[in-house]
Amino acid sequence: MTKKKVFCVQFKGRQRFLRLLGDSSKAKGLRSGFVILKSKESIGLHNTGLSEEVISIINGSGLVCYGKKNSVKIKKNSFVYIPPETLHNVINTSKDLLKYIYTTARVK
């Protein structure tokens, strides 16, 4: 088994999407990324599949919509947990950029 090493990723420039973890040589089961959404923009409806997901809001505000008609308001310094097999979308409802970090971990 290859020994994993501690590493640091620096956010550079104005990238709208930056994968932080996802390369199996860096992490065993975690996946993570940094996302920037413009006003009224969404990440798109997607499913967590066999993974749990957490979203940590760094800037802005918006909604996490999940299931058929459910949503939770998000804003700077908030944290959202999304269970496995959950259809969801992240939407920027503010005039400011919505910046967040997502992390997923396979549980099944």
Positions of predicted regions on the chain:
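A short, N-terminal "cap"/entry segment at the start of jelly-roll beta-barrel domains
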Residues: M1-R31, G44
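Short strand-connecting beta-turns/loops that link adjacent beta-strands
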Residues: S25-K26, L50, K69, K95-D96
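Short, charged/polar surface micro-motifs in flexible loops or helix N-caps
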Residues: K26-K28, K38-S42, S61, R106-K108
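Intrinsic-disorder/low-complexity, polar/charged segments enriched in Ser/Thr/Lys/Arg/Asp/Glu/Gln
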Residues: L30-S32, S42, E52, L97-K99
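Conserved hydrophobic/aromatic beta-strand scaffold that supports enzyme active sites
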Residues: S32-I36, V54, S71, F79-Y81
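A short beta-strand-loop-beta hairpin characteristic of the jelly-roll/cupin
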Residues: S42, T48-K76
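Ligand-binding loop in jelly-roll beta-barrel domains
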Residues: K75-K76, P84-K108
